[in-house]
C-alpha cells in the first residue's frame, strides 16, 4: 500500500501530539505487519477539491489531473493500492475515472483490523460518518472500527451534514454549531471521532467535545 497525505491532514495535525493521520496510519500498519509507504514528494500535489468547491473548477481539474498522473506512475499503473487519509478527498478523487485503486483510510483500517490486537476502553465516543463517507456508501467502516476501540459508541440514527463544508466553518462558524445542535441537542459522549480533519475541527468548536481522527483512536486503542 502507498499512502497519500491530504493537504488538510498535512497542515492541521490530527491531535495535540502533532502526529498526522498518515503518520498514525504508518504506525498502525507496522503494528499489523502490513507494508505501507508514504509517497515521496507528495507535498507538491493536491487533489484540487479545495479549489473546485470554491468555484475554481479549471485549476481544480488541472491539479487533480496532475495528481492522478503522479499516482499512476508511483503505483505502477494502478497495481499498488493507494490509501488516502481524508474521506472527502477520497470521494472527490474517485469521481474521476482511472485505473487507480484509491482506498479511504477507514476502509484500509477495516481491512487490517484482524491483524491488530485491540484494547478497548469504556470512554464513550460519538462517531460521525462525514458526507463523503455517506456518498461512498462507507459509513459502516468508521462505525465498525470504532466499536473495536470503545465499548460505548454513539452515532446518529440518521445521516446528517455537520455543516463544516470544507473551510466554510472557518468563515461561518455558526454553520456546524446550528447543524449539530439541531441533530444532537443532548449529546452525552466524552469525545468525537470522524474521518475528515476539517469536520473534526468544526465539530470540536460547535458541540463542546473534542473530535479526533479515526487513525488517532485506533492507534491509541491497540496493543503496542
Question: Which sequence ranges carry the predicted segments?
Answer:
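Iron-sulfur cluster-binding electron-transfer modules in prokaryotic oxidoreductases
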Residues: 1-224
Amino acid at each position: 500500500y502507498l499512502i497519500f497525505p491530504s493537504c488538510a491532514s498535512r497542515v492541521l495535525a490530527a491531535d495535540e501530539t502533532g502526529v498526522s493521520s498518515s503518520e498514525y496510519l504508518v504506525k498502525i500498519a507496522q503494528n499489523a505487519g502490513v507494508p505501507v509507504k508514504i509517497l515521496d514528494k507528495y507535498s507538491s500535489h493536491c487533489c484540487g477539491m479545495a479549489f473546485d468547491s470554491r468555484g475554481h473548477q479549471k485549476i481544480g481539474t488541472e491539479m487533480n489531473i496532475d495528481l492522478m498522473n503522479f499516482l499512476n506512475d508511483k503505483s505502477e499503473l494502478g497495481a499498488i493500492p493507494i490509501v488516502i487519509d481524508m474521506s472527502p478527498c477520497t470521494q472527490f478523487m474517485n469521481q474521476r475515472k482511472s485505473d487507480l485503486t484509491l482506498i479511504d483510510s477507514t476502509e484500509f483500517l477495516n481491512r487490517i483490523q484482524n491483524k491488530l490486537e485491540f484494547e478497548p476502553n469504556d470512554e464513550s465516543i460519538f462517531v460521525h460518518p462525514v458526507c463523503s463517507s455517506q456518498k461512498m456508501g462507507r459509513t459502516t467502516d468508521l462505525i465498525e472500527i470504532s466499536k473495536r476501540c470503545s465499548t460505548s459508541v454513539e452515532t446518529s440514527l440518521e445521516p446528517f451534514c455537520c455543516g463544516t463544508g470544507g473551510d466554510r466553518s472557518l468563515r461561518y462558524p455558526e454553520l456546524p454549531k446550528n447543524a449539530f445542535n439541531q441533530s444532537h441537542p443532548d449529546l452525552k459522549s466524552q469525545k468525537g471521532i470522524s474521518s475528515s480533519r476539517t469536520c473534526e475541527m468544526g465539530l470540536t468548536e460547535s458541540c463542546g467535545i473534542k473530535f479526533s481522527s479515526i487513525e488517532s483512536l485506533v492507534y491509541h486503542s491497540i496493543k503496542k
